[in-house]
């Protein structure tokens, strides 16, 4: 098996952060292993890192490195073999009318306002519900890899712009797509989050890419449960990708 000191990763250095409060499991401390320097993490290197369980937040490339805890498990959907279940088919039917536009990373006030609306409705008190424009930009709009911003809007007559319902940031890798972050209209009667994953799976198939990386799945975290509902998928356990159940 290749190691972190093999090409092309031997040019990178890895360090562990100090402990900080875990965002997902209460009363636990987390640590991250961070890859540096960021200017050397271009698309090919980043693809290799993601396949080894890393992901990014802005220019920060990391993976969990917690003391005595391995709850965060990287998960990727096998796009070519994916078959939706009944609820996923409903979500696709409900929202397939949305019109998409794929863009380079860019700041738009409309995107930022939807981001704040989403954070305040879904993650109130979590800190991100008061993110400044600079914080939003650093989190989502800074990248050295092959990243895209996707708008999802209601259909509108010619010459008009439909209501913005969802924005997704994704990275295009050598072997798949990596879901960086998605925010959307928090209407409880809609299934925008599920539809977004389905859309990314369909895009991966169209591009001939094998995987959609959904980040980390935590069995004990209710907010992470949705990831394991996309079958078939693989989990990275003890350094190896294994088929999930």
Swiss-Prot record:
This protein's record includes keyword Cytoplasm: yes
GO cellular component annotations of the record: cytoplasm
Keywords, alphabetical: Acyltransferase, Cytoplasm, Transferase
What Enzyme Commission number(s) does the record list for this chain?
2.3.2.29
Family matches, as Pfam families: ATE_C, ATE_N
Q: What is its main location?
A: cytoplasm
**Cell location:** Cytoplasm
Can you cite a GO biological process for this protein? ubiquitin-dependent protein catabolic process via the N-end rule pathway
Intrachain disulfide bonds: none
| Family membership | Belongs to the R-transferase family. Bpt subfamily.
What does this chain do? Functions in the N-end rule pathway of protein degradation where it conjugates Leu from its aminoacyl-tRNA to the N-termini of proteins containing an N-terminal aspartate or glutamate.
Q: What is this protein called?
A: Aspartate/glutamate leucyltransferase
**Organism (species):** Paracidovorax citrulli (strain AAC00-1) (Acidovorax citrulli)
